[in-house]
Amino acid sequence: MYLSFYGLRKQPFHVTPDPEFLYLSPSHEKALAAITHGVEERKGFIAVTGDVGVGKTTILRWYLHLKKREPLKTVYVFNARLTFEQLLRTIYRELDFRIAGNSVTEMVERLYEFLIEESRQGNTVVLLIDEAQNMSDDTLESLAMMSKGETSKDKLLQIVLVGQPEFKRALNTDRLRQLKQQLAAHATIRRLSRGESLEYLRFRLKHAGGDPTSVFTTPALKKIVRKSKGIPRVLNVLCDNALITGFYRRQKPVTERITKEVIRTYGGRSSFFRRQLPLAVLAPVLFFLGITSFLRVKRMRSAEQRGPGHREEIKQDEAIGE
């Protein structure tokens, strides 16, 4: 929509995780290193935690991208609301492995046999579980018991658990004490500092083919950085909507005035935004609002070209819709 206007080749601020635009802060680097080292050394359990929108899923996808040519067999679970049996069936399905028996015990025993054979052949099997805070304690306990399978040197199944802060709190409960004791590494992805946030935005704009100074003024970027509180997903949402608004206004670069308007419209006074609902839900709403704004501006411009009578028709239509 606004790419050619701002001299961009790609959309710089997709809300969905995109490894192509990966920006690694020090805490992101540590999380990636924890996963990489833990899996390579066959340590067993690795945990990564962090707030909503800080880039946990992006790190997982980048890890998979880096390792796609290595002898890894990966199972990526993005819906963690599973019973232990459902999790086992998911593992079997993703490994293209025929389910043995109907009982959980039979499935675990057959899976052990499979893992031992893979280990003998020099292959590593990795289970990646995103949104681990949604997994029940029963399933996590069973997973901890199952992961005890090992050779004389290594764990047979490498398990990476990625979740929000509530998952970290759950690990500190008595019930999941056994699981916590099995963790070989636990990394926390932190929010970006203001300096890192500015660097993040400029990095993405450059990677999209643009000159940051010709797309946003520095005060405009700083305003967005302050509002985002260091959460990359919020940075993306606000910047994308600022670009949409700037495009409709034919304003280049995007000014602080436009970013203030975007923040006020989508975040500043709205309790909806302040409650910090998951932005996976919020983003489509913002997109809809942006499109609505675009259509309204387009209609008004068209009406101005046609004359006063058409402008009056649009005002009547809007009054009916309110």
Regions inferred by a protein language model and the residue ranges of each:
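Mid-core helix/loop region of P-loop NTP-binding domains shared across ATPases and GTPases
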Residues: T83-F84, I99-S142, T151-K155, S193-S197, ...
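A short, basic N-terminal segment
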Residues: M1-E41, G290-K298
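Conserved NTP-binding/hydrolysis module of P-loop NTPases
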Residues: K10-F13, L72, T83-G101
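Sensor-1/coupling segment of RecA-like P-loop NTPase cores
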Residues: A47, D51, E106-R110, M135-S142, ...
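Conserved AAA+ ATPase "sensor/coupling" helix adjacent to the nucleotide-binding pocket
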Residues: R93-L95, P165-E166, D174, G195-D211
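Walker A/P-loop nucleotide-binding motif
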Residues: K43-W62
